Amino acid sequence: MPLQQNQIPHLRFNHSNNDPVLRRIRFSRTLAAALMVLGGWFGAPAANALIPYVYLPTEEELKGSSIGIGRTAAQLLQLGQAKDAARLAALAVRLNPNDERFWSILAEAQLRNNDLKDASRSLARAKELNPEKAGLWFAEAAIALRAERPNDAVPLIARGLQLDPKNAAAYFDLGNARIMQNELPLALESFEKATALKPAFWEALNNQALVLYELGQHQEAVRRWRRVLKLEANAEPMLALAAALHQRGEQTEAIQLASTALAKNPNYVLPLHQAEQLWGRRIREATAQLLGEPELTNIVERAQANATWKKSQ
């Protein structure tokens, strides 16, 4: 039976021949003799029997292992465990450095860890291996946008769209890049292409309204924000619509929408968060006027206390 916890086994013997030290010496001599006999029997020195055998996996076996590791890394990314995913993806590319999928997973993990330089290097390697994969161009553009380099992002997205012209998300990113370049008509065009490909793409429809508002087309912006809220009751279009309605004197609905929006996402009370979401100057100013209404004082103070947003690095 197994030893119980905290018990120390005792050696028992009745006479000197059973001394454990003597037994060990005799056992060692017996073992040495046996090895000598085996060595002579098999025609090799006994010492060879003590050399460990190291198994070296084949290239195919390493590739097979990398697939399982890469798949696990991708699953960890889906679960939001970017650091663990990066470690596994790095192992996968060491085992199989010629598969662009593992480099892509590694780049995504590095991007989520805000390691933009390493993510760019990993994507560059992936593109060397498979330059005709549109997703790699889009991913590199996403890194450029994160680094606030829209001039670099635009040609990368354009190249990706040559390979995958029906990618709604790519047109959305292109629209965001155009906003950052202050090319508002081009931004609107890109967002409209995104919703043409994917009509329920409410984020692109919301950004259409943001651009229209900055272009002075307030009525059309309001109409599109109402369409957005039929698709998704999100705090961003809700507060933007409230600000636009407040400018038109529709006080009751504006106050109600603003109250609901800030309860859903208090971060939108912060002008810097609005700016990071690519809100233009006009809609931010309209929102500031709305949030200055006495009826919203308590709601605004609560949102400011509950806001958790921090500027992306």
Regions found by a protein language model. Give the residues of each.
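Terminal, low-structured helical/coil segments at or just beyond the last alpha-helical repeat
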Residues: 51-57, 260-313
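Alpha-helical segment of the N-proximal tetratricopeptide repeat
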Residues: 62-101, 105-112, 142, 146
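Short coil turns that delineate tetratricopeptide repeat
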Residues: 63, 97, 131, 165, ...
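Helix-start (N-cap) detector for alpha-helical repeat units in TPR-like alpha-solenoids
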Residues: 65-66, 100-101, 134-135, 168-169, ...
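Canonical tetratricopeptide repeat
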Residues: 71, 105, 139, 173, ...
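Position-specific recognition of the canonical hydrophobic site in helix A of tetratricopeptide repeat
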Residues: 77, 104, 111, 138, ...
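Structural signature of tandem alpha-helical TPR/SEL1-like repeats
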Residues: 79-87, 112-125, 147-159, 180-193, ...
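TPR/TPR-like (Sel1-like) alpha-helical repeat modules
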Residues: 226-235, 239-270, 295
